[in-house]
Amino acid sequence: MHPHRDPRGLWLLLPSLSLLLFEVARAGRAVVSCPAACLCASNILSCSKQQLPNVPHSLPSYTALLDLSHNNLSRLRAEWTPTRLTQLHSLLLSHNHLNFISSEAFSPVPNLRYLDLSSNQLRTLDEFLFSDLQVLEVLLLYNNHIMAVDRCAFDDMAQLQKLYLSQNQISRFPLELVKEGAKLPKLTLLDLSSNKLKNLPLPDLQKLPAWIKNGLYLHNNPLNCDCELYQLFSHWQYRQLSSVMDFQEDLYCMNSKKLHNVFNLSFLNCGEYKERAWEAHLGDTLIIKCDTKQQGMTKVWVTPSNERVLDEVTNGTVSVSKDGSLLFQQVQVEDGGVYTCYAMGETFNETLSVELKVHNFTLHGHHDTLNTAYTTLVGCILSVVLVLIYLYLTPCRCWCRGVEKPSSHQGDSLSSSMLSTTPNHDPMAGGDKDDGFDRRVAFLEPAGPGQGQNGKLKPGNTLPVPEATGKGQRRMSDPESVSSVFSDTPIVV
């Protein structure tokens, strides 16, 4: 007879068997999921230096770091991985032959924080290329062949902190990347060294806060030499910014196809850099920022009299705003002097001093300035109109001048005479003979009544009015005479 078996014992073994089978399945799945060309260690997959032409398939979904560097990858398509890798935070694709990246290639890795695309063959960065990487913090693109960067290539990357674009062929400075509060509000490092930048937006760079300029690397570029460039980098040197202090010898510019160090432009006769003071007028409202090299620092302001500036205005016109700036309301002359900002951070402390000069007068309002400008403009327009009228609308007397009528002898001028074109007589001829020529002597009469010789007044003198002569005789002051002589000497005609 067979012994009787209690079915309750079998039911007690089922949970243990199920747990054992689950552990075996999980262990087997982990072993099977690791690609043959990769080395797997927990959630790290290293597939580097395997000469892979494509990304391995069946990547584990729990992968946190994927190293595909030093392979033969040439294109990164949208379907490069069929598995959505939501836990992947680091992707290394350096030292491949990548020349194309799909705009949807990063959709399967939305939580990526570190992306290395350096040492490839990328030539352009198209719009919205990295828009799916909204939490990316570090992006390496150095040592490619990038010539063009689309203005929208880095849209929707509000968490990006470090961007490496050195050793490319970029010729346009991407100003949209460094404007405070623009596309990349947390960007603290932008490496544009060893490119083909010639011109920089110098006025815009001067306005950038120190924490951005501290990580803006521009060395090894063929910049155009000028004094404004020298002033810019001299200010950065004065502030001890890392982007200048770490690469002083590599900051050069081009002039006449020759390289010159930016800090040695004596041939341009650039003036020595001096830190400028803040200037204000009576009654102005002024904000002075504590321009630190790091963000998120605690700031304390001290007045020229070594008194701490409070957050709220108590006595006086100065206070500290919420962002640590010095706020002046209704500036007074006694507010002038040197103010000191003490900035304290977790790993870094900084001390800044700024000088304020207050002019003892007020500026004109905007309406006065506009009125003055309007008056000047109207005056200039009227002047131009008058000049045009004078040049083109002045009446010409010759147009309306009729046939000249002979005037009376009373209207003739008696202060000129005509030199006759009759041939000269022989002065050596004797006797009273005239040799067929009339000889007449004309005396110049005074120009007006009461004038004598040389314009001297002779009271009581009057001018005789000559009688009418024959019709064919030429008048003494004919306007058509060849010449007129103003002299008291008798002229033989």
Curated annotation (Swiss-Prot):
It is a single-pass type I membrane protein. It is found in: Cell membrane; Perikaryon; Cell projection, Dendrite; Cell projection, Axon. LRR repeats lie at residues 62-83, 87-108, 111-132, 135-156, 159-179, 186-206. Keywords: Cell adhesion, Cell membrane, Cell projection, Developmental protein, Differentiation, Disulfide bond, Glycoprotein, Immunoglobulin domain, Leucine-rich repeat, Membrane, Neurogenesis, Phosphoprotein, Repeat, Signal, Transmembrane, Transmembrane helix. GO terms for biological process: axonal fasciculation; axonogenesis; brain development; cellular response to L-glutamate; heterophilic cell-cell adhesion via plasma membrane cell adhesion molecules; homophilic cell adhesion via plasma membrane adhesion molecules; myelination; positive regulation of axonogenesis. Residues 221-272 form the LRRCT domain. Residues 408-424 have a biased composition (Polar residues). The keyword Glycoprotein applies. PROSITE patterns: IG_LIKE, LRR. InterPro entries: AMIGO, Cys-rich_flank_reg_C, Ig-like_dom, Ig-like_dom_sf, Ig-like_fold, Ig_I-set, Ig_sub, Leu-rich_rpt. The modification Phosphoserine is found at residues 477, 481. Glycans are attached at residues 72, 264, 315, 349, 360. Its main location: membrane. Disulfide bonds join 34-40, 38-47, 225-253, 227-270, 290-341. Residues 1-27 form the signal peptide. Residues 394-493 are cytoplasmic. It holds the Pfam family LRR_1. The LRR repeat region mediates homodimerization. Promotes growth and fasciculation of neurites from cultured hippocampal neurons. May be involved in fasciculation as well as myelination of developing neural axons. May have a role in regeneration as well as neural plasticity in the adult nervous system. May mediate homophilic as well as heterophilic cell-cell interaction and contribute to signal transduction through its intracellular domain. Assembled with KCNB1 modulates the gating characteristics of the delayed rectifier voltage-dependent potassium channel KCNB1. Belongs to the immunoglobulin superfamily. AMIGO family. Homodimer, and heterodimer with AMIGO2 and AMIGO3. Interacts with KCNB1. This is Amphoterin-induced protein 1. It comes from Homo sapiens.
